[in-house]
Design a protein with these regions (language model features):
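Glycine-rich, proline-tolerant flexible connector loops at the mouths of alpha/beta enzymes
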Residues: 40-67, 88, 206-209, 307-323
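Active-site mouth loops of central-metabolism enzymes
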Residues: 9-24, 86-95, 175-187, 241-244, ...
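Flexible, glycine-rich active-site loops centered on histidine and acidic residues
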Residues: 2-21, 89-158, 206-217, 264-265
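Hydrophobic faces of well-ordered beta-strands that scaffold small-molecule active sites
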Residues: 3-7, 41-43, 82-84, 112-116, ...
Length: 340
């Protein structure tokens, strides 16, 4: 089992208060994650403040561009992998994105994992890309991934899709890794299908072991239909960590944190029908022993990695304390990770 940390590139106002982290704080968290033995650090992606965040806070949050932050982190680290958790692909021009990601892979010596998804907030997408407001985002996802593949792998690239088009693009340098791992982020049918048909990994968020096992089986089914090696596809998960001395203390810490705002913002999308109690049960919330038991249950369900893990906190010091507790009690119980 491998474990990653979601550094707060674009989490203020959502999972954390406003203000929360400076750019220096984001780098400091990533450096400590490597020192603690985590396998990955990942940044999430927003280009504009979402409506629910504007309504909740009087000041606008700082959203740091994740690839630029990861480039800075690459210069301060040596072994930890650099991920996105996730990058909203429909909001990105694929030619520019391919250049940015290939450059980051070169800077880091081949440490990049690119997790992409359609994004959870329609209002943000329509604000940033109004010309694509009526576009099918599943189609945008497919065209985006296909575009990245040809740009990464062909000496000269042409792509003629419904939404994405470019002609005779010669983009160098290529990534160090071939293929550069692309994960399909999301819990829905389209994300699962793309993971099996086109990607090196599947990265859902905030689901329990049973749902993960069912999704994994579907990913493998799509892979076999496409003639791919299903066993080569990484099954990752973005989960939430809140550790305390007692289960009641952990639940109360979660309920009193800013993270509740984030959970409620997803009630009409990926968390439809998921109660607070079920959310807590599915997340890594509890005592150290309870969290280890939950990790073991996910491992039994076929999980390979906890990627872009979110640590419940209302200050940087609280976030670091949670990371340290997890590293002290959980990482040693699952020693297969690269950094351990």
């Amino acid at each position: 089992m491998k474990f990653g940390v979601d550094v707060p590139t674009c989490l203020a106002g959502m999972a954390y208060p406003v203000p929360f982290a400076t750019a220096d704080d984001v780098v400091r968290i990533a450096v400590e994650a490597e020192q603690l033995g985590y396998d990955e650090v990942a940044g999430n992606d927003h280009l504009s403040t979402q409506r629910f965040v504007r309504e909740a806070w009087p000041a606008a949050p700082d959203y740091f561009e994740p690839l630029m932050m990861l480039a800075t982190i690459a210069a301060k680290t040596s072994t930890v992998r650099l991920g996105t958790g996730i990058l909203v692909l429909p909001m990105r021009d694929p030619v520019l994105l391919a250049k940015q990601v290939a450059t980051l892979d070169q800077i880091s010596g081949g440490r990049v994992t690119l997790a992409v998804a359609a994004g959870g907030y329609r209002d943000e997408f329509e604000a940033v890309a109004p010309d694509l407001a009526e576009a099918n985002r599943n189609d945008l996802m497919t065209e985006g991934i296909e575009s990245l593949r040809v740009l990464f792998e062909q000496s000269r690239s042409t792509y003629d899709g419904k939404y994405r088009r470019f002609v005779d693009v010669e983009s160098y340098p290529k990534p160090v890794q071939s293929p550069l791992p692309i994960y399909s982020g999301g819990n829905g049918k389209g994300a699962i299908r793309r993971a099996g048909q086109r990607c090196e990994g599947w990265l859902p968020a905030k689901i329990g072991p049973a749902e993960l096992a069912a999704g994994r089986a579907k990913v493998h089914g799509y892979a076999r239909e496409a003639g791919r090696d299903a066993s080569a596809i990484t099954i990752a998960l973005q989960s939430v960590v809140c550790i305390a001395d007692t289960a009641a203390q952990a639940r109360e810490k979660f309920r009193q944190s800013t993270f509740q705002l984030f959970r409620c913002s997803l009630n009409d999308t990926m968390l439809t029908g998921v109660s607070e109690d079920q959310y807590i049960a599915d997340s890594l919330i509890g005592t150290p022993d309870e969290v280890c038991e939950k990790v073991a249950a996910f491992q039994e369900a076929g999980l390979d990695a906890f990627s872009a893990t979110l640590f419940v906190a209302d200050t940087i010091d609280e976030m670091l304390d949670q990371m340290r507790l997890f590293a002290k009690y959980v990482l040693p119980a699952f020693p297969e990770g690269m950094a351990r």
